[in-house]
Amino acid sequence: MHKILIRNNYKPLVGKIKINGSKNAVLPIMAASLLSSSPVILHNVPDLIDVHLMSKLLESLGAEVNFMHNKNYKANHTLKIDCSNINNHVMPYKTASKLRTSFLILGPMLSRFGKARTAFPGGCNIGKRPVDMHIKALEEMGAKIEIDGYNIIATVKGKLQGKEITFEKISVGATENVIMAATFAEGVTTINNAATEPEVLDLIDFLKKMGADIEIDNTKVVITGVEALNGCVHKIIPDRIEAGTYALAAIITGGKLELEGINLSDIRCITNELETIGAMVELYDGGIVISRKNGSIKSANVATDPYPNFPSDMQPQLMSAMCIADGISVIEENIFENRFTHADELRKLGANISIEKSKATISGIKSLSGANLYATDLRSTAALVLASLVAGGETIINNSHHLWRGYEAMHEKLNSCGADISISS
């Protein structure tokens, strides 16, 4: 069981942090590589547990995957994927069940090979993540989908058929799955109420480089099926959630961090909210410098919603900041039903948090105290790390392996800016 030990040395974090490629962009793009009969090369790939799990899934299907580390520093790695010799359509349960985005392999496998078998997707334990929208849309396109225990078996006779699909609510995963499924479908597929997150747009950009015919107009995506896709070279967009997490580290500790390698337009939905709680954000080409204005952190009322609104993946980290803010803050979680598991652990540090259904009310206090904590998922672990930076004494975070699913070398990056964090197994 991995543990993180954080000692509060009462130092504001000061320095520069390089932002990695986006976890939420690279995983669907890796799945989309199944659509190409020639190699793809991905740059700016983060070295994460989930990336290696997806690599194992692709290899289990017959792909050749080569992860090339950048030896100079922990960022900008390269991934080469060759799916020209796919010889299997069954994903191993042990691997697929650990990874939520394993379900995204269904669309490209159905589209190119007409069959796929996978397990119900795993990942973080943050409530229901229904795959019903994925299944319904694929069935509308002509797929036959059977559920056998924990397994999902999908087949199609001939080609998938282009259809007009309207999602009842915006879903990033369902949008991505249908886009990939539609690339080889017969005719035109139109998705209404599609997700338009930067990560979805990065997937579309990747597919178009390979030869896909995709047009997007606001929340409407139109895909005209093609006969084949070719490999390409693509650079993964920066991780806006990683950037937002480190931005909050600067605010919480009263420090000043330069975050290098950011798409400014992508992170605006985060920095706009941070400015309301007292952040000073200086923009430059490809990065930001973030610090806290004079005084305490301000309270806020925040709701998570699909892009371009405040992302659910930043909600736990923001809650950590609200624990030491002036006044009372309210956070409403509108994406996932069980994404307040970190609240119990923050209370162990002394935080004053009450939960009622999808709303958390946080009454800010002057200081937190170290404790023995247990992480439950990726973003909650990041939230506990942030809170522990300013908790008096020492804090131990158990089950910290979740962190490496979405953050490469977080402890090293924070330590380089003045934190005192160590890792043990």
Swiss-Prot record:
It comes from the Bacteria. One of its GO terms (cellular component) is cytoplasm. InterPro entries: Enolpyruvate_Tfrase_dom, Enolpyruvate_Tfrase_sf, MurA_subfamily, RNA3'P_cycl/enolpyr_Trfase_a/b, UDP_GlcNAc_COvinyl_MurA. Coiled coil: none annotated. Keywords: Cell cycle, Cell division, Cell shape, Cell wall biogenesis/degradation, Cytoplasm, Peptidoglycan synthesis, Pyruvate, Transferase. The modification 2-(S-cysteinyl)pyruvic acid O-phosphothioketal is found at C124. UDP-N-acetyl-alpha-D-glucosamine binds at R100, D313, I335. Pathway: Cell wall biogenesis; peptidoglycan biosynthesis. Its EC number is 2.5.1.7. The keyword Transmembrane does not apply. It is found in: Cytoplasm. It catalyses: phosphoenolpyruvate + UDP-N-acetyl-alpha-D-glucosamine = UDP-N-acetyl-3-O-(1-carboxyvinyl)-alpha-D-glucosamine + phosphate. The active site is at C124. SUPFAM superfamilies: EPT/RTPC-like. GO terms for molecular function: UDP-N-acetylglucosamine 1-carboxyvinyltransferase activity. Belongs to the EPSP synthase family. MurA subfamily. Cell wall formation. Adds enolpyruvyl to UDP-N-acetylglucosamine. This is UDP-N-acetylglucosamine 1-carboxyvinyltransferase. It comes from Wolbachia sp. subsp. Drosophila simulans (strain wRi).
